[in-house]
Amino acid sequence: MAQSTALTICGLVYSPAIGQELVRLHTSDIDELVYFSSEREFCNYLEARRNSIACLILEWGEGTPQIITYLHHSATLLPAILIFPAAPAPPPAGPHYHIAEVILTTDQLDQLNRQIEEAITGFVKLCPGCAVPPHVLFRLPALKESSNVDPQHRLSQKLKERLGYLGVYYKRDTAFFFRRMSPADKRKLLDELRSIYRTIVLEYFNTDAKVNERIDEFVSKAFFADISVSQVLEIHVELMDTFSKQLKLEGRSEDILLDYRLTLIDVIAHLCEMYRRSIPREV
């Protein structure tokens, strides 16, 4: 039997009791565990290792809403467990981070190990293969069926793969909208979007590339900044112009660039879907 790949569980916990419980779990079924009481250290770790994390554990505190905002705006969507105080009031209604999050109270810490698997399973069923390290799919028996999903690069298949994932975004903070940013912040965001979109185009027809993750990252940033479809189109046209000039210098045909209309349609389709789902149902 092949050796299983380690899971990485990353926690932000403030109370020693929860930290001790995580340490206890680390000696049982979880192969790798890191947790922090400092929000800054937690965010720094995520910046460096977000693609290797299988599940987040967040103890609810005064700074947790800001941490969740950070996760959303950095396009970091992962399986998650939120831990609330057991008394006196019940946990506030969610979702807080996304609709597949698992809620526990401090008197349910004995369930934490099992709920980690529940959080991963629920998130992968929400969106097969999205934002979860591939080895996690094979680590948990409940996910074996989901692990057989073959990521296709046809528009119709990719729409099917990510429909559930798109539904996790249900609120936006207008303070972060593009039109309210400073000129410097606008330039920074557009540079980020151009860089991500260029990677999407270059990897789009590469079956080994994680293009879905790139599209999710691009669309998430655009959605939370209220970027218009026309701005996305402008980014696409600018990039195609750059490629066209390079092809001309190399004496090659520009016809290949027509294939990337599918890339543009794919990205715009998902951005429009996110905008559609952000409209309250009663409207």
Swiss-Prot record:
Lineage of source species: Bacteria, Bacillati, Cyanobacteriota, Cyanophyceae, Acaryochloridales
Protein name: Circadian clock oscillator protein KaiA
GO molecular function: identical protein binding
Domain KaiA N-terminal: 3-163
Lineage: superkingdom: Bacteria
Spans annotated as Flexible linker: 164-172
Region (PsR domain, not required to form KaiA:KaiB:KaiC complex, or for a full KaiC phosphorylation cycle): 1-146
Assembly: Homodimer. The KaiABC complex composition changes during the circadian cycle to control KaiC phosphorylation. Complexes KaiC(6), KaiA(2-4):KaiC(6), KaiB(6):KaiC(6) and KaiC(6):KaiB(6):KaiA(12) are among the most important forms, many form cooperatively. Binds to KaiB and KaiC, the N-terminus (pseudoreceiver domain PsR) is not required for either interaction. 1 KaiB binds to one subunit of the KaiA homodimer. KaiA and CikA bind to the same region of the KaiB(fs) form and therefore compete.
Start and end residues of each KaiA C-terminal domain: 173-281
Classification via InterPro entries: CheY-like_superfamily, Circadian_clock_KaiA, Circadian_clock_KaiA_N, Circadian_clock_protein_KaiA_C, KaiA/RbsU_helical_domain_sf
